[in-house]
Curated annotation (Swiss-Prot):
Domain of life, per lineage: Eukaryota
Name of the protein this chain belongs to: ATP synthase subunit 9, mitochondrial
CC per GO annotation: mitochondrial membrane; proton-transporting ATP synthase complex; proton-transporting two-sector ATPase complex, proton-transporting domain
GO MF annotation terms: lipid binding; proton transmembrane transporter activity
Organism the protein comes from: Podospora anserina (Pleurage anserina)
Residues annotated as transmembrane: 83-103, 120-140
A UniProt-annotated Pfam family: ATP-synt_C
Keywords: CF(0), Hydrogen ion transport, Ion transport, Lipid-binding, Membrane, Mitochondrion, Transit peptide, Transmembrane, Transmembrane helix, Transport
Amino acid sequence: MASTRVLASRLASQMATKVARPAVRVPARAFTAGTKATPLQAVKRQQMSSIITATRQITQKRAYSSEIAQAMVEVSKNLGMGTAAIGLTGAGIGIGLVFAALLNGVARNPALRGQLFSYAILGFAFVEAIGLFDLMVALMAKFT
């Protein structure tokens, strides 16, 4: 027990002196007025535009870089577009039902043909708007 205390204190004192010392000793260098070479000279020689474009390319990369992850993103985009496009089937069925009801109504009462036709066009516009909205969602899922 006592030996571990002595060993621990000795290790602590050695580590404290090692931390305080620099890892590498650099000889003192006299700078003259004739040479103004600095460690940043290589960076100064580079074009700023090339540095900026390099950092932009780094920041524009996605958070994942594997090919499998990239393929999974593409597959999920296509699946999302496909499932959203199924709604276009509903729009087609809705338009068919609107005009089927128009034909049925005109067959029952031919005198209301003009008024029923205006209602049918209004219903067609509403159903078509839903279909176009669905198409927009599908394209947004694919291209974003």
